Amino acid sequence: MTTESLLLDVQAVSYAMQGRTLLAPVSLQLHVGERLLLTGPSGSGKSTLLKIIASLLEASAGKITFEQRDITTLNPEHYRQQVSYCFQTPQLFGETVYDNLALPWQIRQQKPTREQLVASLASVQLAAEMLDKNIEQLSGGEKQRVGLLRNLQFMPKVLLLDEVTSALDEENKLIINSLIDSLVREKNLAVIGISHDVNEIRSANNVLKLHAPAQGAEHEPA
């Protein structure tokens, strides 16, 4: 990997709240077109680390650079468009699936065609009729897919995935992972994900195992 391909450099980042360490110091690097997976037991700080990288939480110590610039010096809105975080339980907005998929376009003062959004739904095996479906009628798996598609309307450079396939059956997990793999391969998307799925771990370039805060983290062979 070259310096030019380095997107994220996480340097000894840790997090504590009310005197309790929730994330022991972690260091990692993420390059263009790389897929890195975080594993480890509950309470090891995996989601906390992703939220810090996404600039949703402020680290207690350490430093993160994006394209060799300290993320604390960057415009948060612009940074989050480039480094996009997908929640395990998506926060959906408005009333319909259309409202959610159109939101990234509206932020950029643009309007998508229905054909564009229908094609997006088709990429994760969701029917065109889903576009007008009320979000309260969606299953957990449908919500996860809609949340992911919302983040992919404008391709970020880095996608942060917080167990986004946890509510999916094996068939739909395969669909989502195939989509992500193709984006990594064809669009040079870089991904940091949290997963305990053996197949997802095997597809990663690197695996970082987090332990309890007193123990830190270790890289494992993918």
Q: Model-derived features: where do they sit?
A:
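Conserved ABC ATPase signature
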Residues: N134-L138, E142
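Conserved catalytic motifs of ABC-family nucleotide-binding domains
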Residues: P90-D99, R108
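Helix-to-loop junction immediately C-terminal to a conserved catalytic motif
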Residues: A54
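Conserved ABC transporter NBD signature motif
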Residues: G62-D70, Y79
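Conserved ABC ATPase "signature" region
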Residues: R114-M130
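Hydrophobic anchor residue at the start of the ABC signature
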Residues: G147-L148
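Catalytic Walker B motif of ABC-type/P-loop ATPase nucleotide-binding domains
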Residues: L159-E163
